[in-house]
């Protein structure tokens, strides 16, 4: 079974800090093709901006591998017009893309900052997404 996900930037950052962490496992699943990343140019811009911040000290090669893999495996979508309130306007693009995807398929927004998004069953933490993946393996 394929899962369609929008990965919030904080999930990608956490994954690069520790590939063995739950966010790291989610990123690995995306790069392996079990999880299909849902993308938008604005999301890629955010990934690029945040991952290249000097404070994180990520190896450029690791960033390139992650972003190239997400692009290769991902699907680019338009952003839906939303009526739900998203407290941080910078995060709206993640919610807009998941809402666009949900018009045609089940899709999840995976974030470490649940409070930044409307309370919906498809807005999940990395741990919840991993539970969904493992549950449906059985």
Task: List the model feature ranges, each with a label.
Residues 41-44, 62-86:
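Acidic catalytic patch
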Residues 2-4:
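Extreme N-terminal starter segment of soluble prokaryotic enzymes
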Residues 84-90, 115:
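Acidic, metal-coordinating catalytic cores used for nucleic-acid/nucleotide bond scission
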Residues 56-57:
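Membrane interface segments of multi-pass transport proteins and intramembrane proteases
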Residues 6-7, 17, 22-52:
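PIN/NYN-family metal-dependent endoribonuclease catalytic core
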Residues 88-110:
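Acidic, metal-associated active-site segment
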Residues 103-138:
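Acidic, PIN/NYN-like endoribonuclease modules and their adjacent C-terminal/linker elements
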């Amino acid at each position: 079974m394929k899962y369609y996900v929008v990965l919030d930037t904080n999930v990608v950052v956490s994954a690069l800090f520790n590939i063995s962490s739950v966010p790291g496992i989610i990123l690995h699943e995306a790069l392996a093709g079990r999880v299909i990343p849902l993308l938008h140019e604005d999301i890629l811009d955010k990934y690029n901006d945040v991952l290249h911040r000097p404070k994180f000290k990520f190896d450029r090669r690791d960033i390139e591998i992650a972003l190239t893999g997400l692009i290769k495996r991902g699907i680019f979508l338009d952003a839906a017009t939303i009526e739900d309130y998203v407290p941080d306007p910078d995060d709206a693009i993640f919610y807009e893309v998941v809402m666009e995807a949900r018009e045609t398929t089940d899709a999840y927004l995976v974030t470490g900052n649940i409070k930044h998004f409307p309370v919906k069953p498809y807005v999940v933490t990395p741990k919840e997404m991993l539970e969904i993946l493992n549950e449906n393996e059985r």
